[in-house]
Amino acid sequence: MPGVPLPFVVLLLLLLLAGTPAQPFPRDLAARSTVGLAATAAYPRFGGLRGDNGTARLGLDFQRMLRLNGTLLVAARDHIYAFDLRQDRGTLYPERHLTWEPQDRENCAMRGRRQDECHNYIRVLVPRDAETLLACGTNAFSPLCRTYQVGSLAQRGEQISGQARCPFDAKQSIVALFVDGSLYSATVADFQASDAVIYRSLSPGQAPLRSLKYSSRWLQEPHFVQVLPYGPYVYFFFREVAVELSALGKVLVARVARVCRNDRGGSPRVLERRWTSFLKVRLQCSVPGDSVFYFDVLEAVTPPQSLHGRPAVLALFGTQPNSIPGSAVCAFYLADVERSFEGPFAEPRGATWTPVPEDRVPQPRPGCCAGMGPAAGVVTSGDFPDETLLFAKEHPLLHGAVRPAGGRPLFTRTGTRLTQLAVDTGAGPRGNQTVLFLGAEDGRLLKVLAAAQHPGGTPGDSREPGDSGNSSARTLLLEEISLYDPGRCHSPRGAGVPSRVLGLELHPPGRELIVAFAGCLLRLPLSRCGRHGSCQGSCLAARDPYCVWLPSRGCVPFSEDLPSGFQQDVEGSLGISGTCQGAAEDSDEDGDLAHDLVPGICRSLHKVCVQAGIPRQLSTNPAALAHWDFFPFPTMQVLTSQNKPWDHLAGWNFVEKLRIYAGQSFKKVFGMAGNGGWRGHCGSSPGFDQKEREKKEFSFLSARIRR
């Protein structure tokens, strides 16, 4: 602005910024589609071996699962199950299993444990090499480990102690991973669960290495979530009671810690057989604003993913246990995680923790790897000066925190505790879409299309329902799926919240997801494209990266073998928002009439229901449902007219809707009146022939189906 003094411009800018309203807390996204239990009831599930009375009585007691190519290994109570995911997608039953029961249950009971606790809960299941895996179980509070063949599940070699490699109690956390032939594990190492440990063992020619014992500065009641290697380090993700916030009470915070892969422990004087490189820093997932809102309880962390072309991890966080329920997903670039370990150290000063002045930090800098960077002249970790080792022993915590990519969460949800996270960063025909699958404590699954733009970018204009107010206008809650059915998923005793999702495992080649509860496993497709039937508008407006519109076949799941010419509108650039009459609408919980696991069913059912023209008002208006609910439609005749085995679907809600609408149309065609439904009007008429009535009904509906 020529002629205007610079101070005036600065003052004007400050006034404008001061007048800018604070950014509101992100509103919950409205689900574009909800799928009820009636629609997911036919998904394959597994709750135990046929004839296994123990599992039938006690429940499956799922612990963890591991996918190795097309094989899914599931660890549970006293069993490991192997599922071949390349076989029939309409079933979920193990092709192999092994039984590993404890031998000393009496000693467990003498320690005051309940009978149902004195089993072998298999808590560790990690690949050791291409042919073998390590399994560790609680073994009635006396943990043991065994090596098994991946293919046959045959035991290899002798069993070894599981102490510090597996918890004593199934409720205690554990993460484990083989790196460079060594087992890195993080758990508790004693019966009382007072000795939390980060441990390296089974190293050829090396003594085991562990964290400092009984040190609240190192570990304070940790709950371990993930372990992964990256560069010269191994990273551990966990939550713990914050020692630096003890003045506020028992506050949980998320952490990421790291150790050097070449760490050999300290000198005989300081940190002998203890980590010399152990450092930890806070992991921060928060909503920015005048008053920052933190999600501190770390629940899940993905393996490294490619996010916007950069290595990153995505993590699921929740609010404090005594707080209002809420959850958030944040992404962290691994370069930012690495950089955070170069920050200042923290130490207590009275009731607060403050940064350590740089001139008080010894050299080589504590936490460095021997032979690298500032410690390039140090041959092994035992050669570090005592001053460096003593400082590392007393100062494991770094000041500050790792901030999320974009400065804010990718997705937030209030009123819900989300428990598990799986991520597909290669969704869509071009493999450039990121989809989050989030399991909840109440048994639901959320399917979220993450923002295509850089996280935390300026939200764009969007007129989609529920889009505004979140971290990005392009983040969409595609589906909200109800999965937990207490009548079909037997809950083990002491399972806590039986509806809590305990595990999610993606199987991209099969375009499916395995969902684990304490009492059962479910196998479901990544999409429900068939619910849109022959409605192009509904298919494209769904903005599901797994669904495409093919003129010759309708709305179908994308696969590499599809012919060219399909359409998709994930970005919403076409502005399509309408649906066709009869297509399953966004919030129609029973609109998912079938799914892609049973070939042929989906399209035939949509042909029946779409052409029957079930209007939305009948599916959502209780008065309309009550008005027409008594029409005695001959369900099996009509459904078998499609030459399909429909018997197992006879109780689905869509059949009731078909009865309702067919009854209304039938009444109009034959000029009948009355408000009691077909049965109320004619069912009691003297001399009415039941067979003749069914014949007319069948002929009428068949005509509607064929037209």
Q: What label would you give each PLM region?
A:
Residues 2-510, 520-523, 531, 536, ...:
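Disulfide-stabilized extracellular ectodomains of secreted/luminal proteins, especially beta-rich
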